């Protein structure tokens, strides 16, 4: 069956790299700005590029977002995740959701958020077409949360999660970056919290980036330790679907919620890669830890550039590597996770 028409054209072939991996999932950063100061991402807060406003590129406009999403949709993309920075800081965020959700071929629109605006906006975003949420909650202890994020807003974030569930979201996931000595002892508290909530808790191993070498050395903890504790407590690892992401998911018969482990240092982590990334300035990134981005923005100025846009994306995909090089201490040119949306 052909893919739906986009800009009057029908495309038959989905995106695929040289290792037979197919890419149905786009992570689209719409801003680098964030109002939190998480130790593992932007410990000093968001700092605009040097030089002030003169010469600084603006983030992708609503029309540029429409064109890039349409281009990916024409090549088989079915899911778009809006990331940042904190995506909800965009004044036109609801319009962005509507634009992406109304793109022919797009079936799921997700966002990753720090959750500080969820309580007031969850219903609005749901009605606009947002279908899934990932909310960052690195600790359930208010003091620890404040220490990790730089903001004393745990209560507001937790209220936002409840508001999202009440608004009708069926897919709510909680992201917690695993930090040795900070939150790696809080597994029992997290499991008790999700026991009666239909959410998936995802522990993410701390990843090495250019500006975080010291933090990585001091606080990296292996997700394998959490995995063993789950198995010992009767949690069952779920079979991974062909189009699932890298998370290893566990369920327990006495828990409504599940647990996902994202362990980029584990064997074969990249084998099932199904996602591509576009930065807030319009660069295509084939890997979170790649060395260079591929410029797309010059092909986002008019609807008539779709053929060229899609060809550039396909050509770039030929060069996608089989795996990252984190085991070699090589994090590419990613200075921090906010720079291309994590």
Swiss-Prot record:
Binding site for S-adenosyl-L-methionine: 40, 85, 136, 207
Domain of life of the native organism: Bacteria
A GO BP annotation: Mo-molybdopterin cofactor biosynthetic process
Sites where the protein binds [4Fe-4S] cluster 2: 270, 273, 287
Positions of the Radical SAM core domain: 18-247
InterPro entries for this protein: Aldolase_TIM (IPR013785), Elp3/MiaA/NifB-like_rSAM (IPR006638), MoaA (IPR013483), MoaA_NifB_PqqE_Fe-S-bd_CS (IPR000385), MoaA_twitch (IPR010505), MoCo_biosynth_MoaA/MoaC (IPR050105), rSAM (IPR007197)
Matching Pfam families: Fer4_12 (PF13353), Mob_synth_C (PF06463), Radical_SAM (PF04055)
Cofactor(s) needed by this chain: [4Fe-4S] cluster
Pathway membership, UniProt: Cofactor biosynthesis; molybdopterin biosynthesis
Molecular function as annotated in GO: 4 iron, 4 sulfur cluster binding; cyclic pyranopterin monophosphate synthase activity; GTP 3',8'-cyclase activity; GTP binding; metal ion binding; S-adenosyl-L-methionine binding
Annotated GTP binding sites: 27, 81, 112, 173, 275-277
Keywords: 4Fe-4S, GTP-binding, Iron, Iron-sulfur, Lyase, Metal-binding, Molybdenum cofactor biosynthesis, Nucleotide-binding, S-adenosyl-L-methionine
Binding of [4Fe-4S] cluster 1, residues: 34, 38, 41
Cited PROSITE patterns: MOAA_NIFB_PQQE, RADICAL_SAM
EC number in record: 4.1.99.22
Catalytic activity: GTP + AH2 + S-adenosyl-L-methionine = (8S)-3',8-cyclo-7,8-dihydroguanosine 5'-triphosphate + 5'-deoxyadenosine + L-methionine + A + H(+)
Cofactor note: Binds 2 [4Fe-4S] clusters. Binds 1 [4Fe-4S] cluster coordinated with 3 cysteines and an exchangeable S-adenosyl-L-methionine and 1 [4Fe-4S] cluster coordinated with 3 cysteines and the GTP-derived substrate.
Function comment: Catalyzes the cyclization of GTP to (8S)-3',8-cyclo-7,8-dihydroguanosine 5'-triphosphate.
Family per similarity comment: Belongs to the radical SAM superfamily. MoaA family.
Subunit structure, as described in the record: Monomer and homodimer.
Protein name in the entry: GTP 3',8-cyclase
Species of the source: Aeromonas hydrophila subsp. hydrophila (strain ATCC 7966 / DSM 30187 / BCRC 13018 / CCUG 14551 / JCM 1027 / KCTC 2358 / NCIMB 9240 / NCTC 8049)
Species classification: Bacteria, Pseudomonadati, Pseudomonadota, Gammaproteobacteria, Aeromonadales
């Amino acid at each position: 069956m052909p893919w739906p028409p986009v800009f009057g054209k029908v495309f038959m072939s989905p995106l695929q790299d040289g290792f037979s991996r197919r890419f149905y999932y786009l992570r689209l950063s719409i801003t680098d700005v964030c109002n939190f100061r998480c130790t593992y991402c932007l410990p000093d807060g968001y700092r605009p590029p040097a030089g002030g406003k003169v010469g600084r590129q603006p983030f992708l406009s609503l029309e540029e977002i429409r064109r890039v999403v349409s281009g990916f949709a024409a090549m088989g993309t079915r899911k778009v995740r809006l990331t940042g920075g904190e995506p909800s800081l965009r004044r036109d965020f609801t319009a962005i959701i509507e634009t992406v959700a109304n793109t022919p071929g797009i079936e799921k629109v997700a966002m990753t958020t720090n959750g500080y605006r969820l309580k007031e906006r969850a219903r609005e975003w749901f009605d606009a077409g947002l279908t899934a949420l990932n909310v960052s909650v690195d600790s359930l202890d208010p003091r620890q949360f404040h220490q990790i994020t730089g903001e004393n807003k745990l209560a507001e974030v937790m209220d936002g999660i409840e508001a999202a569930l009440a608004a009708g979201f069926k897919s709510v996931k909680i992201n917690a970056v695993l930090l040795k000595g900070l939150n790696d002892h809080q597994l029992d508290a997290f499991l008790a919290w999700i026991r009666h909530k239909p959410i998936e808790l995802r522990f993410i191993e701390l990843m090495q980036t250019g500006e975080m070498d010291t933090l990585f050395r001091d606080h990296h903890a292996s997700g394998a330790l959490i995995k063993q504790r789950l198995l010992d407590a009767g949690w069952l690892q779920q079979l991974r679907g062909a189009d699932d992401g890298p998370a290893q998911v566990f369920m327990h018969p006495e828990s409504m919620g599940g647990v996902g482990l994202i362990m980029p240092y584990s064997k074969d982590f990249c084998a099932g890669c199904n996602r591509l990334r576009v930065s807030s300035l319009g660069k295509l990134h084939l890997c979170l830890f790649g060395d260079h981005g591929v410029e797309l923005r010059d092909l986002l100025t008019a609807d008539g550039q779709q053929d060229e846009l899609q060809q550039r994306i396909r050509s770039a995909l030929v060069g996608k590597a089989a795996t990252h090089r984190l085991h070699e201490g090589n994090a590419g040119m990613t200075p921090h996770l906010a720079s291309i949306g994590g």
